Amino acid sequence: MARDTTLFTTAYPASRLLGEFSGRLSRRSERISLLAADRNPVDEVRYFDAGRWPQHADGGGSSLELRDLDADNQLPETWAASDESHQSGWRTYSYRKRGTSNGGPNEWRDFVLGLLDAGEILLDDIRVVESPDGNAVQFLTNTSFESGATGWRMVGNHRLSRVITDPDNPGNKVLHLVSEGATEHMHNHIETTLAGGRSVNSSRVYEISFRARWLTGSNQLHTRLYFNRAAQT
């Protein structure tokens, strides 16, 4: 059963498709039953989103996949979150917004990013440029992580993030972002102080760009200038 039958058959042409799934599964817990044509039960499983169940398959990106067809699928250990590292490539993201203040605190001069749920992604070439079409000014340092994690702070449930060698390019360094839960406005994120203690100007345009590669779990990255300026997911 698949929600998008065309996409499924294109990706898995050798697999047998029984029909289209038009329902909706809960992100918390659901009981799924498989019945034969005569309505006799063939299999049944109830999944959860916590405890021993994979945290990366919680409705934010990765799917829940059975690791062994011959194992007892009632056990959480027989399930895993899908690994997207071999199916996703590097993509460049870029957006522009004014540095308009929302009335929040302005004493910190930081750039902040984090995932909206548990997950892992690779990041590189993170840039914040003020007035990109005019007198462009780069607001960040160590944007390509060639100096390791210098200048970057991994906080709270993003603390396991680290700089690693790019799996696809041994001569390149990237940030392996590892999140155990949702980012927050004061904690649970990755942050860096703006170069030279620069301030964000409410009337100026800022271009925020980066390269990213999704690995597993949530693929929703939130970026912003502190407090909540030029924010986007």
Language-model features and meaning:
Residues 1, 45, 79, 95, ...:
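Generic structural hydrophobic/aromatic packing signal, biased to beta-strands
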Residues 1-74:
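Solvent-exposed beta-edge/loop recognition patches
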Residues 2-3, 35, 69-71, 80-85, ...:
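Low-complexity, flexible helical/coil segments
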Residues 11-13, 73-80, 138-139, 187-188:
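Short, charged, solvent-exposed linker or helix-capping segments at domain edges/interfaces
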Residues 15-16, 47-49, 62, 78-85, ...:
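Short intrinsically disordered coil segments
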Residues 21, 51-53, 79, 90, ...:
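Tryptophan-centered motif/residue detector
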Residues 30, 65-66, 75-77, 94-98, ...:
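Short C-terminal domain-edge/linker segments immediately following a structured domain
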Residues 83-233:
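Extracellular and organelle-lumenal recognition/adhesion modules and their flexible linkers in secreted
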